[in-house]
């Protein structure tokens, strides 16, 4: 694969944004944003949008960053297009103190960094997409934290596009709505976005996938919380009386179709994920 030239503005923004901790907190999912730190990046982005000439750039009380870019001359009658990315990062690994660095990848295992003297690496077996990236410069964390490319890569791309439009008025484009939303990782995302004020006929979420891939449908899911209550009895006197809540859960899990799990499904096939 030929080395891809990266837009310096995208790279600079990405390296800067990932160093701002924005982890959402599932334990606080009853409030939006679930973590106050998401305002840190939200305020930075709103200010940068204002500097780039975006209209009505602001941060809502729920940490949504919203702004609009007028259509270029001659494109005023085109449908408004929305571009969306999310501020927060997942809780699956530490998100504060991210130290991004660039690794020139030559193939094989990708070593991001070290933890306790041991290399932190990703293999092509676990991440087949690496096979298409030999010869590329890849941004990695130092191995002690997540990187936050999901979705600060999308944030950086959208911001760089806004900057490019601001610098070159000859670029044709419809009216654009920009939104950076909180708490996507815990199931909220665009939940509290004012669609009418956003004012876009169509919108795309810039979040992951290989270069050139465009998806025109949305993933859809529903969530349920199931509570299992047992009866605690001393094991020596438990016959006919003890109810093990853990076993109830196992029985429940066994009722779900085994092959309808994420590891066995693809495409339009639905799945159950506990």
Regions found by a protein language model. Give the residues of each.
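Generic structural signal for well-ordered, non-membrane alpha-helical segments
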Residues: 3, 7-10, 34-42, 151, ...
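N-terminal capping segment at the start of a domain
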Residues: 7-35, 140
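Flexible, glycine/charged-enriched surface loops at secondary-structure junctions
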Residues: 27-28, 56, 170-175, 258-273
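A non-catalytic alpha/beta surface segment that caps or lines the substrate-entry region
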Residues: 29-78, 82-84, 88, 99
